[in-house]
Amino acid sequence: MTSRRHLVLGSALLPWIAALPARAQAAPTRLLLGFPPGGTVDQISRHLSARLGEGVRVEARVGGGGRHAVEELMKAPADGSTLLLTPMSMVTLYPHLYPQLGYGAADPVPVAALASLGFALGVGPAVPASVRTLADLVGWVRAGGSSLPGYGTPGPGTPPHFIGALFERGAQCTLPHVAYRGAAPAMRDLLGGQLAVYIGPEGDFLPHLAAGGGAVRVLAVAGERRSRFLPDVPTFAEQGHGATGLDRRELYALFLPRQARPELAQQIAARARAVLAEPATAALLARLGLQEAAGGPAELGEVVRVDHAAWGPIVSRVGFTPES
């Protein structure tokens, strides 16, 4: 979810994108991303420029929480000259949220699943050290332990937003949502004591946990099982919060424009599998708090279908609208 994670993952794919089928290379190949580089723009730009390959360029279509990049993909020709690397929720969740969206979940052509990430709930120095579990957190909130805002997330209408809303309802406590413009400012406020709780990708917490000092404590992870990156942290369900939706994960995937040929998607997916099999790719994903995810067009298409169907009842239960 953070811009650094999107861009570094994109850079790892550029060598094989540069070797796309001949028709795709007849014109510059665009790799669309929906998020800005943020504070690491110089480092990421150098990394990308060294690996772009002939005729390939990364193009950030920033805005709308990633929606604009998907909408740009929908306008592109279906000849392989434009690809999209995006969190899957831009395709599966957003059609439930925005009635005027320029695409549906079935419109982008699935190519390959690349990596998955889990979400976690963590607290910062504004929360007493005695708060070690979700039960402790709920008790502290109910007792009026803080005058600070509720839980922060990287943005409104994102998976962490819904995880927080479902937790608040299940715990029967008042924990308002605070939407940030990305993970970086939210983590800054969490570490600075201006935010009590943050829900976001596990990778957002890992550098601070590795630094030690106890400034950040992760109380729960979303998902059906514990995270390989946070094996000592119990899931929401293990702590008595098993509502549907608290098992949400995110998937990074590649898509082509609507009506792209199946053979083209298969060719690109085969190259993606080769890159994912490289040890350097595995090391990169681990540093970012991501797990490898395998799946070609058919498998990704089924995951998209199931995920889109799962989000509908969750959105209805939370009652989210763009105006809310």
Label every model-predicted segment.
Residues S89-Q100, L166-G170, V197-V233, G312:
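A ligand-binding cleft/hinge motif common to bilobed small-molecule-binding domains
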Residues S116, L206-L276, A309:
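C-terminal lobe and pocket-closing loops
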Residues H6-A24:
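N-terminal export signals
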Residues K75-S81, H96-P185, F236, L251-L284:
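Hinge/capping helix and adjacent helix->loop/strand transition within the periplasmic-binding protein
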Residues R169, C173, E263-S324:
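An extracytoplasmic/periplasmic, membrane-proximal ligand-sensing/linker region
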Residues L20-D107, P156, Q172-P201, L206-H208, ...:
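N-terminal (or domain-start) structured segment
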Residues L20-L31, P77-S81, V138-P149, A211-A215, ...:
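Immediate post-signal peptide segment of exported/extracytoplasmic ligand-binding proteins
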